[in-house]
Amino acid sequence: MNESRHARLHRATSETDITLALTLDGQGRSDVDSGIGFFDHMLTALAKHGGFDLELKAKGDLHIDGHHTVEDVGIVFGQAFRQAIGDKRGIERFGHALVPLDEALCEAVVDISGRPYLAWNVVFPREKIGTMDTELFEEFFRAFAMSAHIALHLTCKSGTNAHHIAESGFKAVARALKVAVSHDPRSAGAIPSTKGVL
């Protein structure tokens, strides 16, 4: 296992330039600037409720739209997560959380399996929150799951307010990840798989 459980990455393309630092065993601190206000709000919540320390500076082609920026942040965040988690020895591997925010209730289930997958069952009642297209939340979580090599199921069980649904979803993922990356004191540092590898 990577004892520091930390990663710092830089990724530059013709569309985005992203620098991200992630510490899994953090204190929920964040310094986030993606250029998209509501997205920053969600990433801050993700760090806080996951217990991660997150630094992010992203510059993207927002004059076009937010798609490239949001998706590429998901890619880099996933890559950093995968690097920080190391060989996965001694982790719980699975995580589950139900998180309410007023009328909204989202459920997240995570398996740090090495088998990337996103099951997305979230419907938003409007197309935008602030300047952010709500369809981009799925793009973010898909990019994250694929790059982190995890299986992630996110389901909205109830909700009528788009802001509440998004925030409930991000917090649910954060809490599920917090459980999944935590140390299992009974595992004696073993890889949590009958195959011996994840």
Swiss-Prot record:
Pfam families: IGPD. The keyword Lyase applies. Keywords: Amino-acid biosynthesis, Cytoplasm, Histidine biosynthesis, Lyase. One of its GO terms (molecular function) is imidazoleglycerol-phosphate dehydratase activity. One of its GO terms (cellular component) is cytoplasm. It is found in: Cytoplasm. The keyword Amino-acid biosynthesis applies. It comes from the Bacteria. One of its GO terms (biological process) is L-histidine biosynthetic process. Pathway: Amino-acid biosynthesis; L-histidine biosynthesis; L-histidine from 5-phospho-alpha-D-ribose 1-diphosphate: step 6/9. It catalyses: D-erythro-1-(imidazol-4-yl)glycerol 3-phosphate = 3-(imidazol-4-yl)-2-oxopropyl phosphate + H2O. Its EC number is 4.2.1.19. PROSITE patterns: IGP_DEHYDRATASE_1 (PS00954), IGP_DEHYDRATASE_2 (PS00955). InterPro entries: IGPD_sf, ImidazoleglycerolP_deHydtase, ImidazoleglycerP_deHydtase_CS, Ribosomal_Su5_D2-typ_SF. Belongs to the imidazoleglycerol-phosphate dehydratase family. This is Imidazoleglycerol-phosphate dehydratase. The gene is hisB.
